Amino acid sequence: MSYYAFEGLIPVVHPTAFVHPSAVLIGDVIVGAGVYIGPLASLRGDYGRLLVQAGANIQDGCIMHGYCDTDTIVGENGHIGHGAILHGCVIGRDALVGMNSVIMDGAVIGEESIVAAMSFVKAGFRGEKRQLLMGTPARAVRSVSDDELHWKRLNTKEYQDLVGRCHASLHETQPLRQMEGNRPRLQGTTDVAPKR
């Protein structure tokens, strides 16, 4: 793991969290229980405090950063998709930020909201509970449906279960030279399916 102290502040990682060895955590970063931090994620607590609350996930290639005297927060069961950038913002409880989205300084994403992939949320945006946000700049297009929230929660549960699976079986190895016969396929822990 790549953990760095900065001006006396050392990252705090709950023992039940999983942080991929290629992720980088610097300074004032606090990672809660059951959190998943994916490969190549960068959490730079060298300006402001970064809080990733219980059950949340920060996926591959995400960046978290912020300003002094402010907290950048991913709320409980927050779901941050691959390549997203969070800068000085607050992501509400049980919200989802889609892949490659950017959430700017002072923005607040309401709890149980979904930010569509590739969206840009402007600085100072104030979201409400259970909004579907999309576009550049992002705007609320409607409320999140019960089915969409259920789908989001199943995906978040997959990542919460992945924490234990990674602790139990993930390890560095050498590649095989050819595929073995009867190679098994991985199975999820829920019945979630891709959104169509």
From Swiss-Prot:
Keywords: Repeat, Transferase. Pathway: Amine and polyamine metabolism; carnitine metabolism. Residues 173-196 are annotated as: Disordered. InterPro entries: CaiE, Hexapep, Transf_Hexapept/Carb_Anhydrase, Trimer_LpxA-like_sf. CDD domains: LbH_paaY_like (cd04745). GO terms for biological process: carnitine metabolic process. Pfam families: Hexapep. SUPFAM superfamilies: Trimeric LpxA-like enzymes (SSF51161). Overproduction of CaiE stimulates the activity of CaiB and CaiD. This is Carnitine operon protein CaiE. It comes from Escherichia coli (strain SMS-3-5 / SECEC).
